[in-house]
């Protein structure tokens, strides 16, 4: 998914949905780090992608917080 599409999707979500998305991404990042440590991870770029997506979710949450 392209970045602009992903951010637009995030902007349409409620605060609760964003918090759930952040939790899911953090779990995914944990699993990826575990795979990296055990040598099972083939696509190391996925770590960067998930980290950036977590930052995007946090940014949208902060924007919503400031707008309310």
From Swiss-Prot:
This protein's GO CC annotations: cytosolic large ribosomal subunit
Keyword field: Ribonucleoprotein, Ribosomal protein
Keyword Hydrolase: no
InterPro entries: Ribosomal_protein_uL29, Ribosomal_uL29, Ribosomal_uL29_CS, Ribosomal_uL29_sf
Superkingdom of origin organism: Bacteria
GO MF, one example: structural constituent of ribosome
Record has Repressor as a keyword: no
A GO biological process held by the record: translation
Family in the record: Belongs to the universal ribosomal protein uL29 family.
UniProt name for this protein: Large ribosomal subunit protein uL29
Organism expressing this protein natively: Limosilactobacillus fermentum (strain NBRC 3956 / LMG 18251) (Lactobacillus fermentum)
Lineage per the UniProt record: Bacteria, Bacillati, Bacillota, Bacilli, Lactobacillales
